[in-house]
Amino acid sequence: MNPAFKFCPSCATPLALITQSEDGGDKARLRCPACGFTHWNNPTPVLAAVIEYQGKVLLAQNAAWPGKMFALITGFMEAGETPEGGVSREIKEETNLSTDALKLIGVYDFQRMNQIIIAYHAVCHGEVRLSPELVDYRLFEPESVKCWPAGTGYALAEWLKSRGHTPQFVEFPKRDS
């Protein structure tokens, strides 16, 4: 449930958690008691790219991230575009690279962010020029790149397996409970 969604976009009445009968039975959702609007809270489609550039894997560091984490190029689909068109657009916007070939790696749920990740392998060319949202990039040999145990890290692992590599995962320090 997205707690940030508090008011009806149709009439501005505060939303309430209201249980109603739906096709699958009774379901509690944020609904407008005044006009009946339902906030479905559907997952958001996110596009991700394992970029193969000059025979290596390109990972980038987002300006908003703490530390030195590098990850796949990702972004949201725009209305009216296909996933393939969207991932090519994101690659161009964020790295200035042109996409020569795309192949679907897989679709992954990312429950923590209420997202569905649609991941592609993209063979790209051109001169890397990062957008302001990225601060750095690195090129990794496929056999030495490390995956992360969440979201797009699983897409990278799947692509590595398809290339005959055994994925290695970064181990994050355990948080105190």
Predicted regions and their residues:
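A short coil-to-beta-strand element that immediately follows conserved catalytic motifs
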Residues: L17-T19, L97-G106
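Conserved Nudix-box catalytic region and its N-terminal flanking loop in Nudix hydrolases
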Residues: V46, E52-E93
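NUDIX/MutT-family hydrolases
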Residues: L130-K161
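Charged phosphate-binding loop/patch that engages nucleotide di/tri-phosphates or the phosphate backbone
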Residues: E158-S177
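Active-site-adjacent beta-strand/loop module that shapes the phosphate/pyrophosphate-binding cleft
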Residues: Y108-R129, P142, W159-L160
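Acidic, metal-coordinating catalytic segment for phosphate/diphosphate chemistry
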Residues: N2-A49
